[in-house]
Every structure is written in structure tokens, then in C-alpha cells.
Curated annotation (Swiss-Prot):
UniProt keyword terms in alphabetical order: ATP-binding, Chloroplast, Molybdenum cofactor biosynthesis, Nucleotide-binding, Nucleotidyltransferase, Plastid, Transferase
GO biological process, one term: Mo-molybdopterin cofactor biosynthetic process
Protein source organism: Gracilaria tenuistipitata var. liui (Red alga)
PROSITE patterns from the UniProt entry: RHODANESE_3
Name this polypeptide is given: Probable molybdopterin-synthase adenylyltransferase
Function comment: Catalyzes the adenylation by ATP of the carboxyl group of the C-terminal glycine of sulfur carrier protein moaD.
Enzymatic reactions: [molybdopterin-synthase sulfur-carrier protein]-C-terminal Gly-Gly + ATP + H(+) = [molybdopterin-synthase sulfur-carrier protein]-C-terminal Gly-Gly-AMP + diphosphate
Enzyme class: transferase
Molecular functions per Gene Ontology: ATP binding; molybdopterin-synthase adenylyltransferase activity; sulfotransferase activity; thiosulfate-cyanide sulfurtransferase activity; ubiquitin-like modifier activating enzyme activity
InterPro entries in the cross-refs: Rhodanese-like_dom (IPR001763), Rhodanese-like_dom_sf (IPR036873), ThiF/MoeB/HesA (IPR045886), ThiF_NAD_FAD-bd (IPR000594), Ubiquitin-activating_enz (IPR035985)
Source taxonomy: Eukaryota, Rhodophyta, Florideophyceae, Rhodymeniophycidae, Gracilariales
Compartments in which it is found: Plastid, Chloroplast
Length: 355
């Protein structure tokens, strides 16, 4: 992706504001002009967007779009640092507009006070280079992914739950797209942010990572998180990278976004009951230990996703469970699907429970 800097010039004030950028070898004058020329759209103005918007505006990005139809609620304030008590009941995008202008008065800010859906997504994103996806549901992510794919836009994905966050960059230089990680055919469903807990600072961290990836793409520096999912666990202060296996022979005209998932056999809870009655099985719960202790399926064992690639666990599953049917699961399929791809890569036969 290239950014035309022929028409971009830095004012005297901008040279003062971005002085610490300009002395960096990988940025300098031309890099700052690229940031100024970039056009970034945020879909969602919640916790992830809050930190990313602030830093990108402060970094000198001169065109930012924000799409969200939501209003500020008291329950937002612990993680959505763009807002305060006085903003409760107001449209988020109006407040975001004012905050960006306070930080970067020269920034061209476009706000869309509507829900992004299959009918308006392509229209909204067409004038931007990068789409930062801060939504909290699968339906919106699939719509964003498809629109970015068809219009050749970089899709920067982030998600949080509890003390854990995920981030990846999709559709970058013919790299994987969101459906390669979570195929639509699985009919995945996950509770939205207002239905489960999340530590506020987790959203800030992942949002900043999204901003970092956007800046790396714009500047053409570093290793972009394309083809990998980065998983950050706040409690362990750990980072894990998981490779995303892309579909083969993709082209714009014929790619189907509801591709069947070929990595493993997916079973329902009803199928599980039938298999249990006929075969020896081993249920592997890939959630964190504290989640497993609170609730788990009968006779399940716990191998957290972050540990599933260890030599010890691979040896255990490949050699000690050879006479058993391996079934992996988690609460919402997010982590079990990643675990399934890892097992597939290591040629370990298994089933994925659509729980």
C-alpha cells in the first residue's frame, strides 16, 4: 500500500508537534507525510476504538472516520476513555468528533451515526485505506471482512474478553481474511460486551495494538500481523502468536465467505451424547484454568490454549490418547477453533464441539 505524499506538506506547527517522530530513522519527514495522507475508518467507537483514535489523531493522521449508532452509557465509562459522566446519553460519534478536533484541529473527521450493515458498509469504507474493526459481534465482522476484501482495504481486527485480547491484520497483500480464522459456516455466536465481563485496561491495550499495526502499514515498517493471530493474556503478561491458515486459490469473483470448514469434524452437543455412548472419548477444555474451575463439561480435562502447542501436551495427545476420540471445546468456540487449527497442523485427529 502506498500513500501519495507529493501533495502533503508539513506546517511549522506540525514540525514542532511531531518532532519526536521526525528524528526516527523509519519515519522522518516522508513518514510523517504518509501519516498525514492516510485515511483510516473506525467501525465502532467503544473501548478498543477509544485508545486507538486518541493515538492516531495525536500521531498526525489527517483523515479519520468513525461509524457507530450507539449512545454513551454509564457501563461504558470504565473502558471507553473518550467519554465521561457528562456524555452519558449522547451519541458517541459526536463526542468523538470533538475529541479528535481538540487533539488534531487539522484532521478531517467524518462521522456516521448509523449501524454498519451489509447495505451501507461498502459505501462507507470506499474512501478509506484502512478499516479498524472494533465491533463486538461476528455478524458485523463478517460484513466488514467481505467489504474490505472486495474493495482491497486493510482490515485490522481486535477483540477482547475478560483478561484476554486478540488482534490480527486481514486482507493485507493477499494475506488471510477474517473468514479464514472463523469460517462463517460454523454459525458462531458470542455474547456482546454488555453481557460478559471485561477489564477496562484490556480494551485499551488491544486498541493501541490496532493503532500500532495501522501505523506500520502506513509507514511500511516492521512485521505486519498478517497471517497470525496475536493473543495477549493480561493475567500472565503473555503473548502468543498463532498462524492463520489461508484458503487456497482465492479470487474476488468466486470466493464464498461461507466456506465449509475443512480442518476438522464439527459436532453438536447431541452428537457428543451419541459418541459418548459408543466410544472412549477425551474432552479437552482450552479455556483458562480459572474459567475451567468455575464450570466445565463432565470428565473434561483442561489444556489452556496458550499451552496446547507444548511438546508435553502434543506428546500426550498424539501418543497417550491414540485409543480415544479427542474433542476440543470452549465456551464460545473462539479459542477451541484456534486450538483445532493447531491440532490439524500437527496431524492430530480430533473433533470440534460447537458448544
Amino acid at each position: 500500500m502506498s500513500y501519495s505524499i507529493t501533495n502533503s506538506s508539513l506546517s511549522e506547527l506540525e514540525y514542532k508537534k511531531y518532532a519526536r517522530h521526525l528524528v526516527l530513522d523509519n519515519i522522518g519527514d516522508s513518514g510523517q507525510k504518509r501519516l498525514k495522507a492516510a485515511k483510516i475508518l473506525f467501525i465502532g467507537a467503544g473501548g478498543l476504538a477509544a485508545s486507538a483514535i486518541l493515538y492516531l489523531a495525536a500521531s498526525g493522521v489527517n483523515c479519520l472516520g468513525v461509524a457507530d449508532d450507539d449512545k454513551v452509557d454509564y457501563s461504558n465509562l470504565h473502558r471507553q476513555i473518550l467519554y465521561n459522566n457528562k456524555d452519558v446519553g449522547k451519541l458517541k460519534v459526536g463526542i468523538v468528533y470533538d475529541r479528535i478536533k481538540m487533539i488534531n484541529p487539522e484532521c478531517n473527521v467524518n462521522v456516521y451515526s448509523s449501524l454498519v450493515d451489509e447495505y451501507n458498509c461498502e459505501y462507507i469504507i470506499k474512501n478509506y485505506d484502512i478499516v479498524i474493526d472494533t465491533t463486538d459481534n461476528f455478524q458485523s465482522r463478517y460484513i466488514i471482512s467481505k467489504s474490505c476484501y472486495l474493495q482491497h482495504k486493510v482490515h485490522i481486527y481486535g477483540a477482547v474478553r475478560g483478561f484476554e485480547g486478540h488482534i490480527s491484520v486481514f486482507n493485507y497483500r493477499s494475506g488471510p481474511i477474517y473468514s479464514d480464522l472463523y469460517p462463517q459456516s460454523l454459525n458462531l455466536d458470542v455474547k456482546e460486551c454488555n453481557m460478559f465481563g471485561v477489564l477496562g485496561v484490556t480494551t485499551g491495550i488491544i486498541g493501541i495494538f490496532q493503532a500500532v499495526e495501522a501505523m506500520k502499514v502506513i509507514l511500511g515498517i516492521g512485521n505486519i500481523l498478517s497471517g497470525y493471530l496475536l493473543v495477549y493474556n493480561l493475567l500472565d503478561a503473555s503473548f502468543k502468536k498463532f498462524k492463520i491458515l489461508p484458503k487456497n486459490n482465492i479470487n474476488v469473483a468466486h470466493y464464498h465467505f461461507n466456506n465449509q470448514f475443512a480442518y476438522c469434524n464439527i459436532i453438536s452437543e447431541q452428537d457428543l451424547s451419541l459418541i459418548r455412548s459408543k466410544y472412549k472419548i477425551i474432552l479437552i477444555d482450552v479455556r483458562q484454568p480459572e474459567e475451567f474451575i468455575k464450570h466445565h463439561l463432565l470428565k473434561a480435562i483442561n489444556i489452556p490454549l496458550k499451552n496446547i502447542r507444548s511438546r508435553k501436551n502434543m506428546y500426550f495427545m498424539r501418543d497417550f490418547l491414540i485409543d480415544k476420540i479427542i474433542i476440543v471445546y470452549c465456551y464460545d468456540n473462539l479459542r477451541s477453533l484456534i486450538a483445532s487449527q493447531i491440532l490439524y497442523k500437527h496431524r492430530i485427529s480430533h473433533y470440534l464441539l460447537n458448544y
